[in-house]
Amino acid sequence: MRDHPQTMRATQVIGLSLLVLTAAVAAQVPVNDEPHHRTVYQNADFRILDVRVAPGESTLDHRHDHDIFTVSMNAGTATRIVANGQAQNRPGRPLADATITEYTGKPGSHKLDNVGAAPYMLFAVENLRDQKAWSAAPPVSALATTLATDGRALRVYDIRLATPTSQTTHTHAVPTVAVLINGIVMSEGPDAQAKALAPAPVGLKRLDSPGQWVLVPRGETHTVVRLGNMDARLLEVEVR
């Protein structure tokens, strides 16, 4: 029996579409394999990424599979995001601009072009845990601590230490990453899990440069103390 010409053309179109789709998916790389997204630390619960794109540079088309927190670590720069063949220009993200983007169960991909005059710099935390295992523990409440974003997979606190409040204490039910925005602080906590969580900084740690971070293991209490006369600010990210 001879194939009908229309049937053959339809088959060819479907085959070509699948080929294009397969090629597009293959061209995407996982975000942690994209050269401008450097993995700083990773365990079974979360991954920390240092994102740096110099002026005039572009990332590869990369794929996000997990909910992710990002915070701008400088005054920002203009960028162009290209997703699904559509380009969108975006203004710079100011220092400490923090967002949570949901990708778990609904992955997305894009590439980023730095079209500004300054580096594009982000500190990022991904929740790698299975969605069914996410914690429903309530948020913490403490001095100088504001719940900034209560996301389904990540929760963000804004801690600002200034006169007269020079320190604050938290106990987190889930692993928590504290990242310095400005000022100088000492993070005080037990280091019993330091070996198991190495090379993550755990326990007594001085943070004196923006972007420095410390890991607070689940269930442990830590105190953040401002050092010197400058105000200090950090963000704490609970991996739920």
Regions found by a protein language model. Give the residues of each.
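Ligand-binding loop in jelly-roll beta-barrel domains
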Residues: 105-128, 217-240
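Surface-exposed beta-loop interaction hotspot
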Residues: 109-162
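Short N-terminal segments immediately surrounding and downstream of signal-peptide cleavage
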Residues: 28-48
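A short beta-loop-beta micro-motif enriched in histidine and acidic residues
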Residues: 56-69, 164-177, 199-201, 208
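Short acidic-glycine-tyrosine-enriched beta hairpin
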Residues: 84-105, 193-219
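Bacterial N-terminal signal peptides
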Residues: 11-24
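Glycine- and acidic-residue-biased ligand/ion/polar-headgroup-sensing regions
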Residues: 65-84, 173-194
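Short beta-strand His + acidic residue motifs that chelate non-heme Fe in jelly-roll/DSBH
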Residues: 59-61, 79-80, 109-115, 167-170, ...
